Curated annotation (Swiss-Prot):
Glycosylation site list: N529
Entry keywords, A to Z: Cell membrane, Disulfide bond, Fertilization, Glycoprotein, Lipid-binding, Membrane, Signal, Transmembrane, Transmembrane helix
Transmembrane residue ranges: 604-624
GO biological process: single fertilization
Tissue expression pattern: Detected in sperm (at protein level). Detected in testis seminal ducts.
Topological region Extracellular: 23-603
Organism of origin: Nematostella vectensis (Starlet sea anemone)
UniProt topological domain (Cytoplasmic) ranges: 625-853
Membrane topology listed for this record: Single-pass type I membrane protein
InterPro entries: HAP2/GCS1 (IPR040326), HAP2/GCS1_dom (IPR018928)
Pfam families reported in the protein's UniProt record: HAP2-GCS1
Name under which the protein is recorded: Hapless 2
S-S pairs: C33-C51, C151-C206, C170-C352, C172-C195, C334-C359, C475-C513
Amino acid sequence: MGRGQIIMILVGLLCLANESYSDVIAKSSLQMCENTGNSDDPYNVVDQKACEKKLIVTLSVRSGQNGTEFLKAVTNVSKVYDQTEKEMARLYNPFIITLAKTPVKLTYPYYYLAMVNNKPTERVVISDSKWHASGSYHACSDAWDDEDALCGFYTDAEGKPIWDSQGFCCRCTEQEKWRGSFNDKNPYSRAGINCKLFGTQAAAHCMTFDDLWYTVNEVGLWQMDFSIHVKAYDLVVEKVGNKTQSKWVDGGEIVIGPTIRSGVGVHGRLHATFIGEFQSHKQFPVLTTKYLLIPYVSEKVDPKTHPQFRNGPHDYMLIDKHEVNYKSSGPHECDKIGVSFSAFRAQAPMGCSQKQGDCLHNQPKDYFEEDTKRRASGKTPYYFPQKFGKLLGVNQRKDNNHFVLTYEVDEVMTSMVTLQISADDVILIYNRAEGKILRAYAQDFEALSRDGNLYVIVQNIGLVTADFYVVIKECSVGIGKLLEKAASINPQQTHSFTFSVKAQQWKGGDNFCIVQLYDARRKMVDSSNVTFRTTEPCVCASSCGCSCFKNGFKCTKREDRDFTKTKPKDSGLDLGFFPKLWNKIKNVWDTVTSVFNFMESGWALLGTALGLLSLGGLKAFLGFRKTGSRIARFGFGGANKGRVRRRDGSGRMVTMEFNETGDRIDPETKEVIEPRNKKKELLLNLFFFFILPFLLIYHLVGWIRWRMRKPGSEDEEQAGTGDEQGGASPLHNIEARAAVDQFLQPDTIVYHSYSQDDYVAQFLINPGKRFCMAGRMTSLSGPSADQFRFDLLQAIQIYEVIDNKRRRLESVNSLNAHYFSRLLNAEAMIDCLSLKPAFPCLNVNRKRKPKQK
């Protein structure tokens, strides 16, 4: 084999979580020298010491191997023993190449999305109504943006109230009050309020937040992270004085892997290339369907003392995405992480019959406490990262500053590496040591669960670091197969192997497994028998409870009842309106009594009297002013203007006319026949608010009497008026009949008065506040002689009213005469018709100064 010859060496690296192999395929001969630890020089093969020699095709290099295996390449060694020719050969400049692979890690990048609260809770506020409110419906307010809302409002960063943060109110219905007062079974109340007659309790249910918050993070796809370290050592001979000394000089290190796939040594004698990774027989966990929840450090939470920060990343939680609602836009659902104010408030009214805290279950704190109990009892957690493998922690990537969740791979992985070295021969030195099983045991666990673990403690009793393999050779029926595990153990040190045991049958009982220990040469050095017991699984089914069983699942049956398949017929007496009526009466009574209770104080009574007198004086003052007459006439008092229908001293309805100052005048001569009594009006208005309640009662009694009057009573009152129509006529005296007759004279023009609020005003252009339209009256034939119709004299609008002055329109406004036609009786004619226009007339040219009413 010529000097400087370039050969290709393919190295396949097989690794467990902390172990790796390298398979070397080369043309050079490989010699394996067994190092038993009795020599100070681990490379005694160079000094021609005795060793076992054979051709090596594969070489294992385990990550974290601590130098148990070396790939030693020698070029131009001075002496080499040729097994074929049975003689020594001379070689020069030997060198050593070592390969090592770090533990394989899976990194899961995660990205921040939102914040959710650790444990929203429900706060209940019980309230009784005050003097100004009666009944439980007034004791609690949950209206939006109501400053008196019993729960108050949460506000955002801008200080604006958050929608639905006011919670909801629960009150006693009238049926519940009746049932509570008569010792009937009262329905469950969420707040436990006391529902009885005259009771005023109500409860506000408010959602509040815990001091601890969690960040919600999106988890990305996993990436494999490891590195392969290749080192070269050159043997250099130096002459010091009269002595020749040799030493190994570090020729540099090449680090390759998924990120840096190739490299060259310092002296260029070694070139390493990472080809790729073989696929594992087992799929790695995919966490893209879950959110990573990380507790958030704030001023209100001390991470040194808070229990949910105690174990760092080991207490983070991986929750299914469908269990988290972090978006404020919805959907708003109860009993999910990130429950919103809208979801909590949407419980009403049915939520009042639910338990306190309903809608606020399945929060991060609940998941944390559940997994903490499982971990303390030796069971596999549901949500902690431990469920998916051995968690190493959270690291930060150097390339993009992203944080990644890091797991250690517990599976055999294979990497392919190509080495190009200038060499003639490769010598393999292989460490081997004796070992023994100190203890092998398994804890009892529940069948069909993932809580079984088998532990094997191994000790290296040799003098060098060596590899050991633990194989679970055989187990009882129903126990799943367990994968082989391996580790490099330092001299006189121990290592603990953990295997996950699964029982794949319902039936519990005694079980066993045989544990075997092998050394680096695959020679069995020790074995042990492990016994353990599995229990029947305990299953919890909805509405059936929990039970541990042996012969399959059974659910408790419901007691047979005679269920009604069709809607039952209505029966019995429904008195549901009584509670409503009683509630209204009680509310009025409570209000009245609260007013009287307030009036018990002498100062309050004096202040109220002065206030009522002041209001009466204001009413009288406005009555004496021209613009305030309407206010003063409310109730009684105040100036009357124009024509007014009222009863005279004999009780008959007559039409009275008043001038601008409120004095009564004669309709024909316009002379004052009854001056206005201002002193009387002033006195009545001063005490008006004192007698207002009695005045209202008086009018109420009069209205009731009018409603209860028999149909014939009006006819009897009208007897003797000369009306032969049997009482259908509303005319009560000769004066009224004469006025009606004037309106019905042939060719007589009458004027119909309107206001801007009347229906016909919408068809006119700027009619003003009060106006009139000229027309004629027609007597209609029928069962009653007092039926008349008003029709427009001409269906056009000639004038408009601007600033209380009549002005001619630029063009005539055509009108629909049908809208202005109106059927009138005698009383209506007297009220709205006149022979002279009282207000500006809009459809005739007659000019007359209008009278302002």
